[in-house]
């Protein structure tokens, strides 16, 4: 699994950088940046791995003896460790700018061996540092840089930015029969835009968005001149994949989630975002179509969705009106999905340690 990693500068970011000589070479110069410990703990709980990466000009020379560096550095590391903060690696470039090395930030030489041994989630990994060289390093690594500033983008602000939920994914699926673009935001509501070419199907998908408390954009070009099969099936596959991607590592989600009455109908939906696709479905219809949607495609939609989303889904409905039967299933699924994707903590809801 790809890992979310924070590559963090030391001087001026984790600890104060002395303005006189820019060297932390005595114990009395060591001072942690405000709020760094509780924020790093929160970021670790949110699933981030930590790597320290620092330039230390002339380390090991007469201008900056190794022993002068080791004392304050070892104390800093001991403080972090005592508070439960673990750095996977501490990467130090000891060279001067004039040495022309490949490991000095913003060059990536110092981090390349680490990257070769670890799968990086580039979309959710960051370089955090107080200098332009840190931002250039982020650009060279193809990840986002966060410019630390004590007065503005400080540790509490960084923690808020990186732990705030805005789970999002986009899937583009193109086959000989359909071209589908699906975009989902699990933590935003309203302003969904859905156009599959099947009016009643659009209405049903909007029920998932509305009752699921999420935003869904779906644009479909399908072979409706033949029938609605490929359009419904491929939309379900793309939507399921997008939901699965947006959930990320699933840390902190409710995972399980509902009985929904609608007029004369009673719909039951049970959902487990388990990583194991399975559908149990029970519904009977009086007619072959509801509006411009084939009723037989309702089961096929949820089967394809559960497969692509990798979830276990149980659905059943009873009632007298086909429109209400179908709509009750989509609404019940939306309400159940709302429960299951809600972030309730910071641990993975599985005794196996993986979903």
Curated annotation (Swiss-Prot):
Residue span of region Histidinol-phosphatase: 1-166
Location within or outside the cell: Cytoplasm
GO cellular component terms given for this protein: cytoplasm
Known catalytic reactions: D-erythro-1-(imidazol-4-yl)glycerol 3-phosphate = 3-(imidazol-4-yl)-2-oxopropyl phosphate + H2O; L-histidinol phosphate + H2O = L-histidinol + phosphate
Record-listed E.C. numbers: 3.1.3.15, 4.2.1.19
Record keywords, A-Z: Amino-acid biosynthesis, Cytoplasm, Histidine biosynthesis, Hydrolase, Lyase, Magnesium, Metal-binding, Multifunctional enzyme, Zinc
InterPro entries: HAD-like_sf, HAD-SF_hydro_IIIA, HAD_sf, His_synth_bifunc_HisB, HisB_N, Histidinol-phos, IGPD_sf, ImidazoleglycerolP_deHydtase
GO molecular function: histidinol-phosphatase activity; imidazoleglycerol-phosphate dehydratase activity; metal ion binding
Pathway: Amino-acid biosynthesis; L-histidine biosynthesis; L-histidine from 5-phospho-alpha-D-ribose 1-diphosphate: step 6/9; Amino-acid biosynthesis; L-histidine biosynthesis; L-histidine from 5-phospho-alpha-D-ribose 1-diphosphate: step 8/9
Coiled coil ranges: none
Cofactor requirement: Mg(2+); Zn(2+)
Keyword Zinc found: yes
Region (Imidazoleglycerol-phosphate dehydratase): 167-355
Active-site positions on this chain: 9 (nucleophile), 11 (proton donor)
Binding site residues for Mg(2+): 9, 11, 130
Binding residues annotated for Zn(2+), in chain numbering: 93, 95, 101, 103
Signal peptide annotation: none
Keyword Translocase: no
Gene3D superfamilies the record matches: HAD superfamily/HAD-like, Imidazole glycerol phosphate dehydratase, domain 1
PROSITE patterns recorded: IGP_DEHYDRATASE_1 (PS00954), IGP_DEHYDRATASE_2 (PS00955)
Pfam families the UniProt entry points to: Hydrolase_like (PF13242), IGPD (PF00475)
UniProt-listed GO biological process terms: L-histidine biosynthetic process
Main location: cytoplasm
Family stated for the protein in its record: In the N-terminal section; belongs to the histidinol-phosphatase family. In the C-terminal section; belongs to the imidazoleglycerol-phosphate dehydratase family.
Protein name according to UniProt: Histidine biosynthesis bifunctional protein HisB
High-level lineage: Bacteria, Pseudomonadati, Pseudomonadota, Gammaproteobacteria, Enterobacterales
